[in-house]
């Protein structure tokens, strides 16, 4: 039977009713494509492709959907974005949820409604997972976004000069590229819960109303793909930390070192807490009792005076010890305190944002009280303070090696201000005040943006300075425990070989056992000319390029303000020189490594 005969055996199709013809004439290309796919799917499933089904399924508008993106450094932005997505789905809105590390930056051009929750790192830079999108939007290949509606929630820390800078930058750039705001940007501080909840409620109400105007059919409730779920880490979390015991506190810098770095071991037995190399440990701490007494004496407040803190009525001394931030000054504190001090100099400082930021960075809260005395009630003073927040430390152990323990590498923050010795809140608690077998409240903070390759045969290059070596100890422990075939290369820097070689004997043993294949050390103060890790990177350009050609993953951990930037500049020089690419090509190559998760950074 010929093809012509086969065609003639089918009965003729009835003509389309006028109302269907009218509807079809108004469809654009995207709607025609959708309709074609829908009809084909219906026919393939054995459903009738007749007109009644077509009439029922025919859309009168594009499906109303929202993309919710997060760019997180410590997990807070991800958590807020997850809740926002859940809230929108509960309102019957179709949601596409993604972390920026899993999102193709070029897809931004096709978005119609976008919510972005982003933190800020370093000196106002976007989180690592947002770098590629940030560069695209600010580069010469930036797409037009005139069909996009958006809203941005920024998370930050007001004690830093560039508060919520990443959120502000994205918000501004979206508008410059033609996008329209759904809602004004919100900048949330460390105690972000109330601001984030209000933003989520407002955007959900707005989008629900817009969806109704578009007569969109509410989307069915859907379970997000398994890959987007946060893996359970046991019942303990930031809000309900595990009361762990301190096993060991060992100073691992020499007596003559300018640094005080501690190797901390904590017992997780009975917690069911699990972590992976690259994760961080959240540590809740109490302030120094001596600092609490100093502050109360300066203010003339009776330690037994009761105030509200953490939903309880507590003596102010207890409240300041466990519920309020006392070691990190903020612009909000200085501005709030200035009227009580009634001092012209402090008023001038508070009125000039640039001067204020410098003052906040250099002057602890207690020293503000010393320099500008004032009398406040206990409630008034507490009202100027932020809630105490846990500190996050890169985990320096692998559970494959240490079992129910977790190890940290903690640099104790110590300095003098106007002759008075000061120490960091959490680092001082761990280094000085927490006794062996004492209790420390902890939780695991996942960091999926800083992971070993899934293929353990892939080589890795680890670049860090100071306590930035911490996660690399965990990496090599894990690779050794798995007897991984992949080569490991450590590039580490610190001031002095004799005083600051963190975990020296362990690195030597790893090398002897065949799990540290290459190593380069930069001791910046051991010779007249300062040598840093970026110098070692340039020195080893040909070798690094060869490892990259073999599929190596590069990891950087340490200071975001200077070290990480200098390392990236050195890597670009390697790509230009050894890879024979121009500057633009080198940038694109590094962006490709980022998107392939072969260039990951944990910087702070």
From Swiss-Prot:
One of its GO terms (molecular function) is sulfite reductase (NADPH) activity. Its EC number is 1.8.1.2. The keyword Transport applies. Its cofactor is FAD; FMN. Keywords: Amino-acid biosynthesis, Cysteine biosynthesis, Electron transport, FAD, Flavoprotein, FMN, NADP, Oxidoreductase, Transport. CDD domains: SiR (cd06199). Signal peptide: none annotated. FAD binds at residues 327, 361, 391-394, 409-411, 424-427, 604. One of its GO terms (cellular component) is cytosol. Belongs to the NADPH-dependent sulphite reductase flavoprotein subunit CysJ family. In the N-terminal section; belongs to the flavodoxin family. Component of the sulfite reductase complex that catalyzes the 6-electron reduction of sulfite to sulfide. This is one of several activities required for the biosynthesis of L-cysteine from sulfate. The flavoprotein component catalyzes the electron flow from NADPH -> FAD -> FMN to the hemoprotein component. This is Sulfite reductase [NADPH] flavoprotein alpha-component.
